[in-house]
């Protein structure tokens, strides 16, 4: 802790986003970066608290006070080494993590100005790549083989940890590229795909084998492996089964997001296959991060208008007494995509889709709802109000979350990790789950070898 009063004298400075008029014309990453000296100043704001709630809040158990201290003193390599003891892929979390740590920072409580932990993390790992700190290493092999099914953040973390422990790791991916959610679920304007490829090259050089276009039947796992890490994610989206669902122009969010990422990777689609918001009135049903990603994608594709509706009530602004510090605050969040242009509405349920004579969607009948608090403090009860209206839309994107998969019975040497085990969560939680799965497999196989 170089300057114990830095948090009093140095204000929080975020790198911010590229100008809206510039960024909506491309799919480049929207977030900017600070220079090295500014980043060191931001790191110096960390107070090295006696009880580091930032560490408590991080699913990975990252140690922000330690890497912030190194960074503030210009020890970039040391900061990188501290960071990667607990996080396999800071370049992913540094871009897309909601920064649970920052909401639990003591400076968030005291002056509502937490340390820029996520941005500092991203700066550290990018400096490590730039300076050549990250090179492929070779690990002594133990003669055992592990198959990882799925190449999202949980699968990649499990593979990375198992490989470092000496196992011969093969990763099976059903799609044509490695990355899972990182590759196809997160827009390029949040996570540039060469960032993934850069990491995959290192993992391949370290001995991990990747097999794409490999759909694995979990009831018939591939033979020849001593253990399996099942990291297949949550591929099934929550549907909206109301009248008119069969109309053309209604798509799951992942359909447009994955297709747009494939287009940016050079894949072509026929006019009939292509899902585009160009010159359309877009309605996004669902108020979470996936819905936000749909908004950003629709605006970049040239939508006439974008409206996002959410069945839940509008969250409080700034502070919510129901989720006090150091908990994750359930408050109104405005993403970079929201800033780019959309109408947001809450407490609306969808009753039916309306269509044209030729079978295309042209609107949605919605109804205002009220949420009645439960007497026992549990989930509030939804009550329709009878106030109905039509929202015009010729492209409807369903972003209402994903369903936890129902997995078949698995052999004792199989460990399930990530969203496949818990249902939909965060990239940071999936990386943590992949690391735990690797440790569990290692303990199981080492016990069996004695």
Predicted segment positions?
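Residues forming the flavin
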Residues: 1-37, 42, 121-450
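Iron-sulfur (Fe-S) cluster-binding segments and ferredoxin-like electron-carrier domains
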Residues: 3-28, 53-78, 100-126
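Immediate flanking context of iron-sulfur cluster ligation sites
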Residues: 4, 33-53, 76-100
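Short helix-capping and inter-helix turn/linker motifs at the boundaries of alpha-helical repeat units
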Residues: 57-58, 96, 341
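Residues at helix-coil transition
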Residues: 72-73, 85, 422, 446
């Amino acid at each position: 802790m170089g300057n114990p009063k830095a948090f009093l004298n140095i204000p929080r400075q975020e790198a911010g986003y590229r100008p809206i008029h510039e960024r909506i014309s491309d799919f480049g990453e929207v977030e900017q970066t600070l220079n090295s000296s500014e980043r060191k100043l931001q790191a110096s704001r960390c107070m090295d608290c006696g009880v580091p709630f930032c560490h408590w809040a991080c699913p990975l158990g990252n140690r922000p006070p330690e890497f912030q201290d190194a960074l503030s003193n210009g020890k970039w390599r040391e900061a990188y080494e501290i960071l990667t003891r607990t996080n396999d892929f800071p370049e992913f979390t540094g871009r897309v993590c909601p920064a649970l740590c920052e909401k639990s920072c003591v400076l968030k409580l005291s002056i509502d100005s937490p340390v820029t932990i996520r941005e500092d993390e991203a700066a550290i790992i990018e400096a490590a790549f730039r300076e050549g700190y990250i090179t492929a290493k070779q690990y002594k092999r133990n003669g055992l083989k592990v198959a990882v099914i799925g190449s999202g953040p949980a699968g990649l973390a499990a593979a990375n940890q198992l490989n470092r422990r000496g196992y011969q790791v093969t990763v099976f991916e059903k799609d044509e590229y490695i990355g899972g959610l990182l590759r196809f679920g997160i827009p390029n304007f949040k996570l540039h795909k060469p960032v993934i490829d850069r990491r995959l090259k290192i993992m391949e050089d370290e001995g991990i084998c990747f097999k794409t276009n490999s759909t694995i039947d979990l009831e018939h796992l591939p033979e020849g492996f001593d253990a399996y890490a099942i990291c297949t994610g949550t591929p099934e989206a929550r549907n909206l089964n109301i009248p008119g669902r069969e109309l053309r122009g209604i798509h799951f969010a992942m359909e447009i997001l994955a297709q747009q990422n494939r287009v940016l990777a050079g894949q072509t689609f026929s006019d009939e296959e292509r899902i585009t918001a160009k010159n359309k009135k877009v309605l996004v049903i669902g108020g979470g991060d996936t819905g936000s990603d749909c908004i950003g994608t629709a605006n970049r594709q040239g939508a006439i208008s974008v409206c996002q509706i959410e069945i839940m009530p509008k969250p409080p602004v700034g502070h919510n007494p129901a989720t006090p510090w150091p908990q994750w605050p359930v408050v109104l969040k405005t993403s970079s995509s929201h800033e780019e242009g959309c109408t947001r509405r809450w407490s609306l349920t969808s009753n039916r889709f309306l269509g044209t004579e030729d079978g295309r969607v042209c609107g949605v009948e919605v109804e205002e709802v009220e949420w009645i608090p439960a007497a026992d403090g549990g989930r509030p009860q939804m009550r329709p109000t009878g106030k109905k209206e039509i929202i015009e839309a010729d492209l409807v994107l369903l972003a209402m979350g994903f369903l936890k998969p129902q997995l078949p019975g698995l052999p004792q040497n199989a460990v399930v990790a990530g969203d496949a085990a818990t249902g939909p969560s965060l990239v940071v939680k999936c990386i943590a789950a992949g690391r735990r799965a690797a440790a569990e497999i290692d303990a199981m196989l080492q016990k069996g070898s004695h």
